[in-house]
Amino acid sequence: MGRDEEAAAQAEAWNHGFGFIKTSVIKTAIELEIPDILHNQGGPLSLSALSSAVGVPPDRLHRIMRFLAHHGVSKKTASPPGESDYYYAETAVSRSLTKDNLGPFVLLQGAQRGPSACITAQGLKSRERPGVEELGSDPLYEDPIFTEKVFRDAMTCHARVTTSAVIENYGEGFRGVGSLVDVGGSYGMTLGMLVEAFPWIRGICYDLPPVVAKAKPLHGVEFVAGSMFESVPKADVIMLMFVLHNWSDNECIDILKRCKEAIPAETGRLMIIDAIIDEDGEGDEFAGARLGLDVTMMAVTYEGKERTHREWAYILTEAGFRKYVVNNIKALESLIEAYP
């Protein structure tokens, strides 16, 4: 190894060593609402004005903003003539970190009890969920504050961003759909967005009784309680979004069989919205995030995972689906159409 290669390798190692600092700084910026402030400003904002808005001393905030700018989370701009203050503006990345975008999801990953804290050597040796074993409890469900605020906000923003991508990049796929069941649809936000975009659809949100009991009425959406392991309401199209990555292959096959039973044999369709891991580990700009999500699922579920094309083909074939098509929706997830 030449000196240049060795220096590059050491630089990469240093960057990995400070990886948690990057997560912590971005998490802190979101908590201070810096991405939202820059977005609402509509143009460059001075360091002194930003300091007043977030309540952080200028000397400290300057160092945070310098770090964020280096990583593309803000942009340092030229100061107006006669001014010596620093000025910063939003970037495409900072817009993606606002509270109406992926900000809440990033907060979950950076939380003290979040998934990123769950990956340890000792935890990986466990036969159970590595993260739950390491923390001694299930952080996603046993802490009411964590569950009701951090976790739920993260899941909501993730669903909103992905549903918007589905509407924008797969809109034609909803033409002619009379009825659609969202299996594991929670409180119906995704289905509500779809029905609003495609008002001819009769939406059915299907989830466990305790979830349905808390759901508020939504125009065009009917709530039905039940278990996807037992049966699924009949419809033209069944949708599974962020569901199958929680379960083992055998459990997924059972769920898929129930979905197949609920759609017409000749015209029915199953829509799966989940990540697909590229076989060779490369892929598009979302490849690294998909691998990170896969490790997260290993930490917080018993046998959940993100699947490769081959693994998706296996569970779909075993469940009796004759063919499937993968649609790129320009998101972390893909949309898989499966036909009985």
Swiss-Prot record:
Please give the InterPro entries that the UniProt record associates with this protein: COMT-like, O_MeTrfase_dom, Plant_O-MeTrfase_dimerisation, SAM-dependent_MTases_sf, WH-like_DNA-bd_sf, WH_DNA-bd_sf
Q: Which reaction does it catalyse?
A: (2S)-naringenin + S-adenosyl-L-methionine = (2S)-sakuranetin + S-adenosyl-L-homocysteine + H(+); scutellarein + S-adenosyl-L-methionine = scutellarein 7-methyl ether + S-adenosyl-L-homocysteine; apigenin + S-adenosyl-L-methionine = genkwanin + S-adenosyl-L-homocysteine + H(+); luteolin + S-adenosyl-L-methionine = luteolin 7-methyl ether + S-adenosyl-L-homocysteine + H(+)
Q: Where does S-adenosyl-L-methionine bind?
A: D207
Q: Which SUPFAM superfamilies match?
A: S-adenosyl-L-methionine-dependent methyltransferases (SSF53335), Winged helix' DNA-binding domain (SSF46785)
Q: Which UniProt keywords apply?
A: Methyltransferase, S-adenosyl-L-methionine, Transferase
Q: Has the keyword Methyltransferase been applied to this entry?
A: yes
Q: Name one GO biological process term.
A: methylation
Provide any one GO MF term from the record: O-methyltransferase activity
Q: What is an example of a Pfam family matching this protein?
A: Methyltransf_2
Positions annotated as active site in the UniProt record: H245 (proton acceptor)
Q: In which pathway does it act?
A: Flavonoid metabolism
Query: How does biotechnology exploit this protein, per its UniProt record?
Result: Nevadensin is a selective inhibitor of human carboxylesterase 1 (hCE-1), a key enzyme responsible for the hydrolysis of a wide range of endogenous and xenobiotic esters.
Which EC numbers does the record give? 2.1.1.-, 2.1.1.232
Homology family: Belongs to the class I-like SAM-binding methyltransferase superfamily. Cation-independent O-methyltransferase family.
The protein's role, per its UniProt record:
Flavonoid 7-O-methyltransferase involved in the biosynthesis of polymethoxylated flavonoids natural products such as nevadensin and salvigenin, aroma compounds which contribute to the flavor of sweet basil, and exhibit pharmacological activities such as anti-allergic, anti-oxidant, antibacterial, anti-proliferative, and anti-inflammatory effects.
What name appears for this protein in its UniProt entry? Flavonoid 7-O-methyltransferase 1
The UniProt gene name for this protein comes to FOMT1
